[in-house]
Design a protein with these regions (language model features):
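Small-residue-biased structural context
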Residues: 1-160
Length: 160
């Protein structure tokens, strides 16, 4: 039996990529940091698109919506995550020319810390509400069909 909750494994892969990105920042490897963040962004955007185009319509139509589980909450968080990644990319491109690099890097890492808390909050909502409810309201055939339409999947432990 397959579960839609298996798609949450991608979150671990994204976390690994983001960790590698932050490690590159700490070593002043700004091109590598940007490249890793772009890879992270690709996975994140694809995952968001899968959720918004494939999974959330089913959830919106059939789920028993509990506190904290309104479909709009997930959409709003997706928007915030996408906007944050855009900001981080923009700021990383400025780092090589930054006259006060230490201050700017600390500022950027603070922003990334906030971003990670937002990601953790969003992951918790998906782990505790969205995916368990999707697993509950879909049949085996529906799960198979939905999984066939999902486009994003890293091979866990090979993300970086």
């Amino acid at each position: 039996m397959r579960n839609l909750s298996q798609l949450l494994d991608l979150h671990k892969d994204l976390d690994e990529i983001f960790f590698a990105h932050q490690s590159a920042l700490l070593h002043f490897e700004f091109k590598a940091a940007l490249s890793l963040l772009e890879r992270y962004e690709y996975g994140l955007l694809t995952h968001i698109r899968d959720e918004e185009d494939v999974l959330l319509p089913v959830y919106s139509e059939r789920a028993e919506i509990v506190k904290g589980g309104k479909p709009q909450f997930f959409l709003d968080e997706h928007f915030k995550l996408k906007e944050f990644v855009k900001l981080l990319k923009k700021e990383i491109t400025k780092l090589p020319e930054e006259p006060n690099l230490d201050s700017k890097l600390i500022w950027l890492l603070d922003k990334e810390s906030f971003f990670k808390r937002l990601c953790n909050h969003h992951d918790k909502r998906e782990t505790e509400i969205l995916y368990p409810e999707l697993d509950r309201i879909t049949t085996e055939a529906e799960k198979t069909e939905l999984l066939s339409r999902v486009t994003c999947a890293f091979s866990s432990s090979k993300a970086v």
